[in-house]
Amino acid sequence: MEQKNFDPDGVGVDNGTYFGLPFAPETAELVLISAPWDVTVSYGAGAAYAPDAIIEASTQLDFYDPLAPGAWRRGIATADVDYSLLESSQRLRVDASRVIDHLEGGGCLEDDYVVRKVRRVNEGCVAMNANIEAQAARWLCLLYTSPS
């Protein structure tokens, strides 16, 4: 959808972007990056599914802001969700849950069984952070090297 056809006061368009905004990341001033990750939550998993749920629900939001009327025109885009992060999150969540259960049952963090799982979870978290950092660097580089 082109910006000229976008009506912020109309029915939200389900186009796979946050708020149904019509901007491509390559031309936006702000790119929203999703992190489908909930490996280390201690009470109930599910946050990893939030990016898709928020994208879907966000088309129902109104854009009126008396302090920044028309701010959406500046260009807010949605980067593609990297679903490999969700897959890693689901896989590592099993290890994290076992560690949490072990500790809640009075187990020790130094047990060999737990140390291996914690190491895998920590390595996965480092990889996830690196992924998000690389995505941000990509969009920042594009933003600051593309002609205005």
Where in this protein do the model-derived segments appear?
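N-terminal small/polar loop signature for handling phosphorylated ligands or for N-terminal nucleophile
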Residues: 137
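N-terminal glycine-rich anion-binding loop in soluble enzyme alpha/beta folds
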Residues: 2-121
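Conserved small/polar residues in nucleotide/adenosyl-binding loops
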Residues: 144-148
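Glycine-rich anion/phosphate-binding loops
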Residues: 129-130
